[in-house]
Swiss-Prot record:
Gene Ontology biological process terms, A to Z: cell division; regulation of division septum assembly
InterPro entries attached to this UniProt entry: MinE, MinE_sf
A matching Pfam family: MinE
Organism whose genome encodes this protein: Methylorubrum extorquens (strain CM4 / NCIMB 13688) (Methylobacterium extorquens)
Protein role: Prevents the cell division inhibition by proteins MinC and MinD at internal division sites while permitting inhibition at polar sites. This ensures cell division at the proper site by restricting the formation of a division septum at the midpoint of the long axis of the cell.
Family per similarity comment: Belongs to the MinE family.
Protein name: Cell division topological specificity factor
Keywords: Cell cycle, Cell division
Amino acid sequence: MSVLTFLKPRGSGSVARERLQLILAHERVENGRPDLIITLREEILNVIAKHVTVERDKVQIKLERGEGVSTLGVDIEFPVDAVIKPKAKAKRAIA
């Protein structure tokens, strides 16, 4: 990773992926935390809401635990006439 790549703002997808990985790793340590699905659902909804309007009750999240592996399933029902929100211009800090 170069210095320029490090300073470049990251996309919401990579941030969401990192958050999910951290949450899943944390869940494996605490094993059985009841509010994990709620936390995951809210994080995922917040990322999606930046791009498309989705009804909160149309998002289903399943966490299945196996031997040494957890699987996260996400089902999102998008309306046929879904409108993609315009990207907001990133604010740049003056160094």
